[in-house]
Amino acid sequence: MNNKELLQDIHGLNKRMQELEKKYSMLSEDMFTLYRLGELEQSQDLIRWVGYYELRQERQRSYTSLLRERLLNLRSASAGTPMPLHPVV
């Protein structure tokens, strides 16, 4: 996956998680903490929510890794001058 695809996935996962956050009045980070502690009853919504959360974490790690690589390339190409910000097509 490239960064553009990763960002699309991350935004899609955020949207799904926000729907569940509104439904249960709880941030995903808090849900995940309670889930890890075994304090939440298993339900279809919880299983989906945990899946979205874990997948988003994985996608964010991949995004960060690709971004670091891209920044290294931009820095070496700019030779100490400010890096231009270009849209990715």
Where do the model's predicted regions map?
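Extended, charge-rich alpha-helical interface modules
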Residues: 1-89
